[in-house]
Amino acid sequence: MFSSRKTLKLHKGTKKEKVIEYPRTFPQRYTIKSYSREQARKLGVTIKLSTNPKKKLDVFSKKTGKKLASIGAAGMGDYPTFRAINADLGRWKRSHYKMRHEKDRHEKGTAGYYADKILW
């Protein structure tokens, strides 16, 4: 049977081993977290909820106001969302996201770059 929750074992085989439960999917309507706003400010961009129902955020240039990218799949988690559930879970998910997207997260100006810097 399909469960609506996932479990993750952190620090397997050590004294710090623990099991964390978290939702498989997240609500379709995303709320912008202060972490993401701060990261966007550091990059010199602004963020708003996306007009695309399949994405979380739209990224805009502060200088021109022009839309640069739509980032984050709606219904999926990100670092601030996972960190709110459990700090260790947030760190684990972040490190795995960065490994998985290593090839496309460094090219400035791409959606992958903004997703990495703002959501993770």
Regions found by a protein language model. Name each.
Residues 1-120:
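Arg/Lys-rich, low-complexity, intrinsically disordered basic segments
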